[in-house]
Curated annotation (Swiss-Prot):
Function recorded in the entry: DNA ligase involved in DNA non-homologous end joining (NHEJ); required for double-strand break (DSB) repair and V(D)J recombination. Catalyzes the NHEJ ligation step of the broken DNA during DSB repair by resealing the DNA breaks after the gap filling is completed. Joins single-strand breaks in a double-stranded polydeoxynucleotide in an ATP-dependent reaction. LIG4 is mechanistically flexible: it can ligate nicks as well as compatible DNA overhangs alone, while in the presence of XRCC4, it can ligate ends with 2-nucleotides (nt) microhomology and 1-nt gaps.
Catalytic activity: ATP + (deoxyribonucleotide)n-3'-hydroxyl + 5'-phospho-(deoxyribonucleotide)m = (deoxyribonucleotide)n+m + AMP + diphosphate
UniProt GO BP: base-excision repair; cell division; cellular response to ionizing radiation; central nervous system development; chromosome organization; DN2 thymocyte differentiation; DNA biosynthetic process; double-strand break repair via classical nonhomologous end joining
Protein name (record): DNA ligase 4
CDD domains found in the cross-reference section: Adenylation_DNA_ligase_IV (cd07903), BRCT_DNA_ligase_IV_rpt1 (cd17722), BRCT_DNA_ligase_IV_rpt2 (cd17717), OBF_DNA_ligase_IV (cd07968)
Residues that coordinate or bind Mg(2+) 2: E427
Keywords of this entry: ATP-binding, Cell cycle, Cell division, DNA damage, DNA recombination, DNA repair, Ligase, Magnesium, Metal-binding, Nucleotide-binding, Nucleus, Repeat
Organism domain of life: Eukaryota
Organism lineage: Eukaryota, Metazoa, Chordata, Craniata, Vertebrata
EC primary class: ligase
Entry similarity comment: Belongs to the ATP-dependent DNA ligase family.
Length: 912
């Protein structure tokens, strides 16, 4: 019977190979529109097959979910964790395929992040595995999408039950019945990173216009696929529901200087920013559920009823007797009843895994309420939600508490609160607008956060030595993306340190250019790290690098972090929380890094917290936004790493002297004319090839603007020319003069030359122009004048207003608004215009103050304004469901009040 029901699903009939070939096409497509087309074709064929399979049956639960959970595995919540990462998969493949341990293919799998040969797939385990598996696998697999999901369910459940032999058995079934291409995508599904080049929001939007919004309030992919199966049918009400996890509202990083402006010059709440785990609690009588910010269910830990868990038994009686149903949002904290203090997350404990007999106890700190007795409160203001929250339960110290807040109005009060948080060793502060409504998965809609590390000058920074490295993945493949940093043992007086203790691993804070430059500087010094024979100068904990560098060849980096916390992963017995590189200390020698004594002194200074200074506000000491410290540049000769060495051109026969003694740097070619072919032809014409442009380089040839080309352009030292110019030279066997159509970038001297030879549209002053060139010039003129209509000039005007601080003028308060007014008896029917209505004057007011007023309601409209007659509000709400970007429906008073007061008013109080 079960088999019969299973076969009545689309997933039971669709080969897994079809999904994989679709994913392969999506990934290989360069244009976003092409990627979307491939996904839509697969989705449409699924829906057609679904209609044919189920005909007109009602209450069909079959949906696109079996495919969607494989396409967006990072959103999977039903299936438990696989407990498998790349290294474990590599070992499993070696064992299951019986590969020799020291063989070439086994080492490829184990060292997948290490660059080798000419391939550019370093760091992409799935691609490495594909080439290892290709000669050993079926040409085409036999599994359906349904069968793949069933086997992955077994992998997850057996991993949860710690039955490794059964995990291997399920994986073996997948391997023996799949092609190499299918396994490439299986690996990505297991690792939960498909690298498709399109976001999950794009995928959900293609599936259904309401999919993103529904997922934000449910985090349930199966529910999204089932309820929104028909793209023509929308949901009338998408809101937070009981026992359905939603994505919580988030806070944006605040600039202390802008707080008053961000809060609309009105009073605001200041709360302590808690350092725990964001958690939502759903309660219905004696039934409880707890969900994390990512939608994971932690009910087993905290308690599904008053008889079980680390929290529910202690808080059940705290709720008022008339409160049966509620949804709360807050932070799960660890409370020490002995010291009556909350523990910081950096200390060695996990609130989600604390046992009942622990010295610490679970405490739920609540700061918001979203439902009480089936009354949904998300659309209520924060002020009203706070009032309701205070009457929902009676706080119990150390078990369930309400986060305290205070009302403030100035940035001085914000600074005082931040300094107080620093003194108390707290994470920071939250700032919330009393009129803000709750918006799932939105950041900064009236909620702000300030942490000491966001403000320059408040943190102690550490000068650490790089002693190890880790190969990167994805866009950082083939280069070091993370570094192992250390402090020195204090040497005898007058000597340099010889032993270093590891402290932390850091992989953020730098741009791709800074990472690339640092990689070039250290490239020739990296050595493989062998765990059995580690270098005597570098002492590690359990965390070992993939490669190491002799300290005397390394550089010091300045690290900023939140605090120093205990850790047995590093030799110092401590590590840094949230470390990031601020700058490379080119002004310091390798032996001038921090010592163990310096580290211990810093750790004892403020119980490990690195924020020890106060923020001051005054005429000469304004609080400043966080800025990247300028990296001091040091003149250096850039070396050439192995895979950038020039090609062997010794066998090339010269056919012309057109490029005699001319030096070129070819970055990339074109379709049909790859980089190597262009280099060979240049050599045939007598030219020289270099891989990095220098002072003697005539020009850089680039078929596309990758990161290296962009860096060359930003240096403004070399001309960057399209390969088409080279092809023209090869064709005519002459050095064709440069023309504007060949140029990607011009250095200052070339710009001056072109200014003398050509007008601003690329038309030569001295050389006759042919028909094709004239067409090209006319196209340029068209582009230059494209911002001519008032609508098209609006963003240009807005930019000018912002640049010269005119955006504070009341005359441009509606500049970013596109407004449709309720002037028509039938929406979008201009022939049904209502005569002699006050909204005509309102439309003029809007235009006068910068708004774009439209007569057609469509995608891109930001506001709909309703007059005294509100009979069409429900029609507008129905229409809004058909749009991807939702407009706000406001009373006319929002416009008139804003104009009267000379500034935009808070929209929430005018919503309909």
């Amino acid at each position: 019977m079960a088999t019969s029901q299973t076969s009545q699903t689309v997933a039971a009939h669709v080969p897994f190979a079809d999904l994989c070939s679709t994913l392969e096409r999506i990934q290989k497509s360069k244009e976003r529109a092409e990627k979307i087309r491939h996904f839509k074709e697969f989705l449409d064929s699924w829906r057609k097959f679904h209609d044919a399979l189920h005909k007109n049956k009602k209450d069909v639960t079959d949906s696109f979910y079996p495919a969607m959970r494989l396409i967006l595995p990072q959103l999977e919540r039903e299936r438990m964790a696989y407990g498998i990462k790349e290294t474990m998969l590599a070992k499993l493949y070696i064992e299951l395929l019986n590969l020799p341990r020291e063989g070439k293919d086994a080492l490829k799998l184990l060292n997948y992040r290490t660059p080798s040969g000419a391939r550019t797939d370093a760091g992409d385990f799935a691609v490495i595995a594909y080439f290892v598996l290709k000669p050993r696998c079926l040409q085409k697999g036999s599994l359906t999408i349904q069968q793949v999901n069933e086997l992955l369910d077994l992998v997850a459940s057996n991993n949860s039950g710690k039955r490794k032999d059964l995990v291997k058995k399920s994986l073996l079934q997948l391997i023996t019945q799949s092609s190499a291409l299918e396994q490439k995508w299986l690996i990505r599904m297991i690792i939960k990173d498909l690298k498709l080049g399109v976001s999950q929001q794009t995928i959900l939007n293609i599936f259904h216009n309401d999919a993103v919004e529904l997922h934000n309030v449910t985090t349930d992919l199966e529910k999204v696929c089932r309820q929104l199966h028909d793209p023509a049918v929308g949901l009338s009400d998408i809101s937070i529901t009981l026992f359905s996890a939603f994505k919580p509202m988030l806070a944006a990083v605040a600039d202390v200087e802008r707080v008053e402006k961000d809060m609309k010059q009105q009073s605001f709440y200041i709360e302590t920013k808690l350092d725990g785990e964001r958690m939502q609690m759903h309660k219905d009588g004696s039934v409880y559920q707890y969900f994390s910010r990512n939608g994971y269910n932690y009910t087993d830990q905290f308690g599904a009823s008053p008889q079980e868990g680390t929290l529910t038994p202690f808080i059940h009686d705290a709720f008022r007797t008339d409160v049966q149903v509620c949804i709360l949002d807050g932070e799960m904290m660890a409370y020490n009843p002995t010291t009556q203090t909350f523990m910081q997350k950096g200390v060695k404990f996990d609130i989600k895994r604390m046992v009942e007999d622990s010295d610490l106890q679970t405490c739920y700190c609540v700061f918001d309420v979203l439902m009480v007795n089936n009354k949904k409160l998300g659309r209520e203001t924060l002020r009203k939600r706070y009032d309701i929250l205070n009457s929902t339960f009676t706080p119990i110290q150390g078990r369930i508490e309400i986060v305290q807040k205070k009302l403030a109005q100035t940035k001085n009060e914000v600074v005082d609160a931040l300094n107080e948080a620093i003194d108390k060793r707290e994470e920071g502060i939250m700032i919330k607008h009393p009129l803000s409504i709750y918006k799932p998965d939105k950041r900064g809609e009236g909620w702000l956060k300030i942490k000491p590390e966001y403000v320059s000058g408040l943190m102690d920074e550490l000068d650490l030595l790089i002693v190890g490295g880790y190969w990167g993945k994805g866009s950082r493949g083939g280069m070091m993306s993370h570094f192992l940093c250390a402090v020195a043992e204090k040497p005898p007086h007058g000597e340099k340190p010889s032993v270093f203790h590891t402290l932390c691993r850091v992989g953020s804070g730098y741009t791709m250019k800074e990472l690339y430059d640092l990689g070039l500087k250290l490239a020739k010094y990296w050595k493989p790290f062998h765990k059995k024979s580690p270098p005597s100068s570098i002492l590690c904990g359990t965390e070992k690098p993939e490669v190491y560098i002799e300290p005397c060849n390394s550089v010091i980096v300045q690290i900023k972090a939140a605090e120093i916390v205990p850790s047995d992963m590093y030799k110092t017995g401590t590590t840094l929380r949230f470390p990031r590189i601020e700058k490379i200390r080119d002004d310091k020698e390798w032996h001038e890094c921090m010592t163990l004594g310096d580290l211990e002194e810093l750790r004892g200074k403020a119980s490990g917290k690195l924020a020890t200074k106060h923020l001051h506000v005054g005429d000469d000491d304004e609080p400043r936004e966080k800025r990247r410290k300028p990296v001091s540049k040091m003149k250096k000769t850039i070396g050439i790493i192995e895979h950038l060495k020039a090609p062997n051109l010794s066998n090339i026969s010269k056919v012309s002297n057109v490029f005699e003694d001319v030096e070129f740097c070819v970055m990339s070619g074109l379709d049909g004319y790859p980089k190597s072919d262009l280099e060979n032809r240049i050599a045939e014409f007598g030219g020289y090839i270099v891989q990095n442009p220098g002072p003697d380089t005539y020009c850089v040839i680039a078929g596309c603007e990758n990161i290296r080309v962009k860096n060359i352009i930003s240096s403004d030292q070399h001309d960057v020319v399209k390969p088409e110019w080279l092809l023209e030279c090869f064709k005519t066997k002459t050095c064709v003069p440069w023309q504007p159509r060949f140029m990607i970038h011009m250095c200052p001297s070339t710009k001056q030359h072109f200014a003398r030879e050509y007008d601003c549209y690329g038309d030569s002053y001295f050389v006759d122009t042919d028909l094709d060139q004239l067409k090209e010039v006319f196209l340029g003129i068209k582009k230059a004048g494209e911002h001519q209509t008032p609508e098209e000039m609006a963003p240009v005007i807005a930019d000018l207003e912002y640049r010269y601080s005119w955006d504070h003028s009341p005359l441009c308060m509606f500049r970013h608004c596109t407004v449709y007014l309720d002037l028509y008896a039938v929406i979008n029917d201009s022939s049904s215009k209502i005569k002699a209505t006050r909204l005509d004057v309102t439309a003029l007011e809007l235009r006068f103050h910068g708004a774009k007023v439209v007569s057609h309601l469509s995608e891109g409209v930001s506001h709909v304004i309703i007059g005294e007659n509100q009979s069409r509000v429900s029609d507008f709400k129905v229409f809004r469901r058909t749009l991807k970007k939702k407009f706000k429906i406001l009373q006319e008073r929002w416009v008139t009040d804003s104009v009267d007061k000379g500034e935009l008013q808070e929209e929430n109080q005018y919503l309909l």
